[in-house]
Amino acid sequence: MDPLGAPSQFVDVDTLVSWGDSYEDEVNSSDSTAEAFQEDSNRSPFLYNRDINGKVVLWKGDVALLNCTAIVNTSNESLTDKNPVSESIFMLAGPDLKEDLQKLKGCRTGEAKLTKGFNLAARFIIHTVGPKYKSRYRTAAESSLYSCYRNVLQLAKEQSMSSVGFCVINSAKRGYPLEDATHIALRTVRRFLEIHGETIEKVVFAISELEEATYQKLLPLYFPRSLKEESQSLPSLPADIGNAEGEPVVPERQIRISEKPGASEDHEEDEDEGLGVDLSFIGSHAFARMEGDIDKQRKLILQGQLSEAALQKQHQRNYNRWLCQARSEDLSDIASLKALYQTGVDNCGRTVMVVVGRNIPVTLIDMDKALLYFIHVMDHIAVKEYVLVYFHTLTSEYNHLDSDFLKKLYDVVDIKYKRNLKAVYFVHPTFRSKVSTWFFTTFSVSGLKDKIHHVDSLQQLFSAISPEQIDFPPFVLEYDARENGPYFASYPPSPDL
């Protein structure tokens, strides 16, 4: 995999000793202890797993020197940060990397974006932006750092990468405590390998001397190399080990188990009120949790007596099931359609999401998988204000989403999708589509009606979103130039669409 003439300092990941092979202990001489521990029900949530340990490498060195499928670069939102990791990567990759980065239009905190490796031994570079840490916003920082690691791994999975070299994403200048950040990094990688381990052969943690002691201390907690080490590490695990995917769990947003199961219903209602409005984490924990009497809930629904808060919790649990499935299922066939993607920001600084109607072959794809892909892409986008640009350009009857599917999507998604959606720009509508949209937003989802804006030309769209902030499919530009004049034909389309 080395490029022609690669410098000799590059290190092939296949030559590195795995975490599992680095363990020196009298495992064979303590079979009775191991067997006894296997029978003990008090096992660690991170079980001893020889196969997973064989995929993990702890290596003290420069991540830019790794010969693997992709390495990770930690940077800032404009991808111009000057830190030791980035500077080494830029120096070895050559000037072409800077030119490629300019096409990405930056990267938000927690996101991951891909470029070629150019003169590196690694074929690709995955760029991500770690959070700035402030103790008062600790929860937000934890969630953002989790997203960095998760999105890097998800991108590696989607691109069928066999090996990934991680730098330490939480750079010192952003102030994230090293030990706290390492817990998140290790458990996120561990959970990902548990679920998607068949897609990745090697994950390397490239660390410096300053970070080595922390990683050596915490790795056994999440990647125990024997049953004995698993047992010894159990007391050192933190109270919050995240949900089934390692994502941080906010305690006040969990469904709490009453200390007195026989308490009155009034007491239970008081606790429900204490949950607050934001229930986005309910049901996402990896471990079993006590819920109310299901039969009683169904009876109350039929009688119209179930409270609004209870209905909201029920909806949140349903959404979390969809989200969990979206994160675990292979959706590469839907992603390859390039029908939904993130581009720049509008004039108010809100994220712009693009939907290309002509790229949706409704009769040829599994629409449930399309819904899963929408949730997979939009879940982290919808936490902030955003707008949708829908290109209806040159669609046929085989591209039109029926009202039942749209109603199902609207009913399934979390409340944040609806609350933070500020506008839908319906580009190049037809008379029929305008009528259909009016009926749908009037009788099915009335809350969406005031957010729909029909846009007959790209010039109208540019009054809300500058042309540099949108990646246009070429056929959209050609159609608009033909229908509304050649002014827009000079604006270059995205080469990937």
Curated annotation (Swiss-Prot):
Residue intervals of the CRAL-TRIO domain: 333-481
Signal peptide limits: none
Macro domain segment(s): 43-223
UniProt cross-references to SMART domains, sorted A to Z: A1pp (SM00506), SEC14 (SM00516)
Tagged with keyword Phosphoprotein: yes
Ranges in coiled-coil conformation: none
The organism's place on the tree of life at top rank: Eukaryota
Keywords: Phosphoprotein
GO biological process: response to retinoic acid
Database matches in Pfam families: CRAL_TRIO_2, Macro
Sites bearing Phosphoserine, chain numbering: 280
InterPro entries linked: CRAL-TRIO_dom, CRAL-TRIO_dom_sf, Macro_dom, Macro_dom-like, Macro_GDAP2
PANTHER family cross-referenced by the UniProt entry: GANGLIOSIDE INDUCED DIFFERENTIATION ASSOCIATED PROTEIN 2-RELATED, GANGLIOSIDE-INDUCED DIFFERENTIATION-ASSOCIATED PROTEIN 2
Family: Belongs to the GDAP2 family.
Name this protein carries in UniProt: Ganglioside-induced differentiation-associated-protein 2
Organism in which the protein naturally occurs: Rattus norvegicus
Gene name in the database record: Gdap2
